Amino acid sequence: KATFCAAILLTAVSKMALVVRSVSRHAKLQGGLLMNPKTVKKALKDAIQAMTDYKWLFSARPGKDNTRNRKFPFQKVIPFILAFRGGTLNHEIMDFFGLDPSTGTSSAFIQRRSTILPEAFESLFHDFSRSVDENKLYRGLRLLAVDGSDLQIAANPDDPDSYYPGANGQRAYNLLHINAMYDLHQLIYVDALVQKGR
């Protein structure tokens, strides 16, 4: 669930940045206000900071987890997870945090990640979406589109509801089905639902 929420949020941010570039000329001609990539990035940073202020709400053990500032503080772990590109964890850590020898190990990151509830990413998605939602209407109506898509994630045989063992030489994988709601006028995701692939 956390992987999905992070993927949806990252997809939303990336898509918004691309769409902003492609429609900016049209929006300027129409006299509309347009959110630029810097504004979108600031909105995401602000949403993460707001979560950090109440990080105990998103901790597996409130009062114990995320109380000290460690090598992987809460406010860095969230954007780090959003920035994953599919490499090994060690490479992801080096890419995101640089070659600083004081950066924590992959084991330390895994421990830190386990202290953050999956609901943190769901909350971030909704808070971020609300912060960029200008409630624009088209002829008095809000135009929404809903579409579904499958997302293959790492194989986990312990989750039989989404596990596919693979056949004909194909690797095993787990499958999630994502239904996302998109505002066609504002070009933002406003909601999403994750379901097991079976």
Q: What are these model-derived regions, one by one?
A:
Residues 3-198:
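Conserved, well-structured functional cores that handle cations and Mg-NTP chemistry
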